[in-house]
Amino acid sequence: MSELHLLSTQQLITGLQDKQFSSLELTDHYIKRINALDSKINSFITHTSETARAQAKAADEMRVQGDKRPLLGVPMAHKDIFCTQGVLTTCGSKMLHNFISPYDATIVTNIDKAGMISLGKLNMDEFAMGSDNESSYYGAVHNPWNIAHVPGGSSGGSAAAVAAGFVPVATGSDTGGSIRQPASFCGLTGIKPTYGRVSRFGMIAYASSLDQAGSMGRSAMDCAFLLQPMIGHDPRDATSIKYDMPDYVQDLNDAAASAGDKPFAGLRIGVAKEYFSKGLDTEVEQAARAALKKYEELGATIVEVTITDPEITLATYYMLAPAEASSNLSRFDGVRFGYRCENPKDLIDLYTRSRSEGFGPEVQRRILSGTYALSAGYFDAYYTKAQKVRRIIIKDFEDAFANCDVIASPTAPTAAYKLGEDLDPATMYLGDVYTIGVNLAGLPALSQPVGLTSAGLPIGLQLIGQYWQESKLLSTAHLFQQHTDHHLQHSTIAKETV
């Protein structure tokens, strides 16, 4: 029982179904670990332990009565960007430090319906703006592999909680790499689905045309289990798209069952030289190329493709995302909800002080740059031009996929750096250089672990797919994980028993 947290989601499901342990015992095991060890990591903002224990007892009773839902009684946790009725929902910001959501986000409702048990809300970069989880009002999150290092961001709390063995899976959101980059830094698998695949209703907006929710776990199969209840059309989200509903878990099982000695025979993996250029750490490049060689040994064909220069993509993203943020975050004014300054002199003072005191430096920086890009005289020169470049980025991906089935790249140019090391915003922004193009194009992508640095820090490989091809991405990673053990390595904190 002391190592329940090291089991995969499939093993947890089997254990619950075979009565090897109860949902209450499993939930208590995770709660005990969180209480004992999260002081080192700071992955949770809000704990919902008592509610979780009540839900676990109910799940055990429902299983006795014949409830066959596979995820019934399996614990998880939500990134604190998803509204949760009756529970503090902060988005990592002082602006929302007292906000109790009056409703559930659609994915929260869907995961509840699947029978999963939420252990709480997870730390994150403030309003999802950051790549290291150091901008949270609730303090920095520490990487479970080495607590002196960052876990990545903005879903750093989600990644750290899974890597530490506090939950088997967690939700995240990805605007420019916020699932994939922390998955890479924490040795996890994390997937950002096609834009429109998962409802954004109840997910606090950063950049509406880029935001997408996804799942994080140690393996592709873990991600598939959590992603399954998250997907589906939602009429309350205008960007939600009606499309075929795949069974990800079945797709992965079918792929494994039909795989021979060369499971990737016929698979064309595109590799762009633009992803292996200046700024890429030597150890990261070596691990990525070794993973590609393994894919090749297992039957895949590596083909060279061309995509938009990542530096152009980076500039485009940091023009469009802050512009959308400046609009989305204008609702936080100290009047309707959120932080309100004390004793304002007048209405203008209320607005000014509430926002300057309620938002942290990184959020203010992006609001200001976005407002500048949208201002009269600069709109056409910056915002409109960036939207035109976005179309070129999409076209370049379309052209690349004419010659390959998936595109592979390093997830991030480096492994996790030390806390406080990357204080220069421009340097931090470069950490997203390989991931943001996917969001601009609305494509699905995942990160999978492919090795460790000499310092013992995880390295991730990104796989990018065509629209609606999450099953192909997950199956590709799953089959790779059948022949490697990178996803089976555990962090320093996960190895600790309590």
UniProtKB/Swiss-Prot annotation:
The active site is at K79 (charge relay system), S154 (charge relay system), S178 (acyl-ester intermediate). Keywords: ATP-binding, Ligase, Nucleotide-binding, Protein biosynthesis. It comes from the Bacteria. The keyword Ligase applies. Gene3D superfamilies: Amidase signature (AS) domain. One of its GO terms (molecular function) is ATP binding. GO terms for biological process: translation. It catalyses: L-glutamyl-tRNA(Gln) + L-glutamine + ATP + H2O = L-glutaminyl-tRNA(Gln) + L-glutamate + ADP + phosphate + H(+). Its EC number is 6.3.5.7. Coiled coil: none annotated. GO terms for cellular component: glutamyl-tRNA(Gln) amidotransferase complex. The keyword Ligase applies. Allows the formation of correctly charged Gln-tRNA(Gln) through the transamidation of misacylated Glu-tRNA(Gln) in organisms which lack glutaminyl-tRNA synthetase. The reaction takes place in the presence of glutamine and ATP through an activated gamma-phospho-Glu-tRNA(Gln). Belongs to the amidase family. GatA subfamily. Heterotrimer of A, B and C subunits. This is Glutamyl-tRNA(Gln) amidotransferase subunit A. The lineage of its organism: Bacteria, Pseudomonadati, Pseudomonadota, Gammaproteobacteria, Moraxellales. The gene is gatA.
